[in-house]
Amino acid sequence: MKFTPRPRPVTTWHLRVRALSLLLSALTTGGAARAQSVVAAPAPPSAPAQPEAAGEAKPATPENPVTPASPATAAQQRIEVTGGRADDTTQRQRSTAAKIVIGREEIDKFGDATLGEVLRRLPGVTTPGAPGRGGPPRLRGLGGGYTQILIDGQRTPPGFSVESLTPEQIERIEILRAPTAETGARAIAGTINIITREGFRRRLNDLRVGVGLENGTVSPGINWTHNDAKGPLTYNVSGSVFRGHRKDESTSQTRDEDVGSGATLREQIESAFTDNRRTGANLSGRLSWRLSEGGDVLTLMPTLFHTVADNRRTFSLVQPIGSTPPDYDSGSSHTDSAFTNGRLNLMWRQRLGGSRLELNGGVGAWRARGDTQRQEFTVAGGSTPVRTIVDGSRTRQESVNLNGKLSTLLGSPPATGPSTGPGNATVGEHNLVTGIELEALRRTETRSTLQNGTPLLTDFGDNLQASSTRLALYAQDEWALNPRWAVHAGLRWEGIATRGDAADGSARPENRSSVATPLLHAVWKPDPKGRDQVRLSLTRSYKSPDLGNLMARPSINSRYPVAGTNTPTAPDRAGNPDLRPEMALGVDLAVERYLAAGGVLSANLFSRRIRDLMRSVTTLETVSWSPVQRYVARTQNIGDALTQGIELEAKFRLDQMVTGAPRVEMRSNLSLFRSKVEGVPGPDNRLDSQAKATANIGADYRIRGTPLTLGGNVNWVPGYRTQLSDEQVTTTPGKRVWDAFALWTFSPTVGLRVLGSNLSPRDYTSTNTLELGGLREAAVNTSPSFTNWQVRLELKL
């Protein structure tokens, strides 16, 4: 950090602001400010403290501590914070494999309530669904297994959502656009590695109390982070408690047409209102013991997340056109659910001469339960339901993993003396990493479905089991050929065996697959002392089918009774044990220019050639759970595909580009995507759910002479049309999300932040059209979006 004092004239308005700041600071801290000195005042809540090395001695408390500066004096000091962002950019610049690093300062900037809200502003990241209702993050517009999400280098369990993590728990986020042997090759679109906060010797005790307001609902939350050290032990503990409340509404219009004549045979309109309440708690920690002065460290990492939800939905169905009356006119449903996820990881690092051994093992388990009752009524039947569906499910999964990694430095610097290449390696030295990963998991699902008291799906039993075992071996070498060139080469082999109950109730099938993935990354600097560099990556990656797609028990569409038929746009769902993994050959080419004070300009081109593409296909089948044929959606390998794109990013301070401009921090990125699925007619035969583009432009500025910081961001994703097959077409609407925040720093220990998300809400309308057997069915789904406000008080206790 660079602190440059600059006296300013003191006005009456300034004195009033400082008096208010002093009063609130005294009330919240008991009058005991913790400033170290007049010059080196602590950073405001928006700028996190920089961690100290674990082995660094903690400075002793002086007998006569320096008296804190008065607010009037402190306000006259000009504080310039450049270290945080420069550190993130330096990590990015020194990485041989292309990597974007987002640190604490950037994560904290907007004061988001969940990590998912932070991710959607990052370069190349999109989220499906309406604003504020999105699902898991996607890189390059590709989700559903194309984007690998890691937490501390470990894959997240099925059913886990990044929405369950708070920004206070995260130290940094790394986005790897191409896979590496160490992080894994199940990353065709890339990898998002979420690094949780580590323990360091500077004491922290932060409390953040906030409330969210949306569509007439209130959602409070509390987050607490504590960090300290005792002797050889450093630890960090983060906890949060939240209560979420959302109200949604939607309209679904379904129209059946005769393809030949164009006549409308049936039209139905369903309107629904949903009230969802969720309460949860999240606790995570990291405890590190330094076992010796040689760098031996033992780290324990427990995490626990628990949430309960209550969802109530009312709906009505009208049929303006149609000869056969609908099955119901109105109805309601109530779902009571809970999810608990716990994990315990143990990591041991030991120096072995010139090598470092790292052993990492963990056990984890998650439990989920859900109980739903749906009742349907007709006008003629009055208050007596014509159909009642009671569905209960209990799912549990246990997992265990053991990883070993050995890092070794080989070779020696040239005789002329050591020099550093473009990456982290010293010229002439090799950073060799070898590792092994073993993971085993077992899932058990118990489910019962009653329709008017009669059990459904009796052929499949109440209990379904599946297990999966994964073994991976890898080796990678990073070395600098000379001050201009650095190379990162790796080879990874991974095998997965899955066994479980089949979707059709037959004997337990087994699915085995293994993949060898060579990976090569290179970086070249035209001038060893310059700020420009060029990156090239040649990779092989893959996407494995998950347990749900392989072994899933049939899921009956609740809108259509099992005794009758359903429609192509409302199919039942089942698994396919014969799926093969998708394979992809990829190339990435990037040009980067690093600016002063942590700025960066970059352009990246990428291409992925995919073989054995997996896609959900809907067909009319004879099924065991119904006396008539029903439409069933199963995931199938349908052929090959190609996706390409360009990604642009610019991050800089405005006064460094325009003389005399204010010190505004600017951030912008633009990504353009194009894809083509072979065997599917064009022109919109793109990969499922891949948008044409995504863009962000944002800025933040601390108003000089005031404790006020303002910032904003605009996220844009255009609408697009997707030809899924010869018969099916979907359209996805565009999104334009405006966010803005204001931070008032009352004192170094107190801040008040206000965030507005989706300031210009728009309706979200998607369509799904399927044409089979001379009949065209089109479904139009519309749901409004809402502005969300967050108000949060940030305290450094």
Predicted regions and their residues:
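Face-selective signature of the C-terminal outer-membrane beta-barrel domain
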Residues: 284-307, 334-502, 525, 529, ...
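N-terminal periplasmic accessory domains that precede
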Residues: 115-118, 135-138, 175, 187-209, ...
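C-terminal beta-signal and adjacent terminal beta-strands/loops
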Residues: 4, 716-722, 743-797
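Gram-negative outer-membrane beta-barrel transporters
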Residues: 487, 602, 606-610, 628-720, ...
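N-terminal periplasmic "start-of-domain" segments of outer-membrane beta-barrel proteins
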Residues: 77-110, 136-138, 144-147, 200
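Outer membrane beta-barrel strand-and-loop segments of large Gram-negative receptors
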Residues: 390, 399-405, 576, 580, ...
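Extracytoplasmic beta-strand/coil segments of soluble accessory domains associated
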Residues: 99, 116-154
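Short acidic/polar hinge/loop motifs at secondary-structure boundaries
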Residues: 138, 154-180, 224
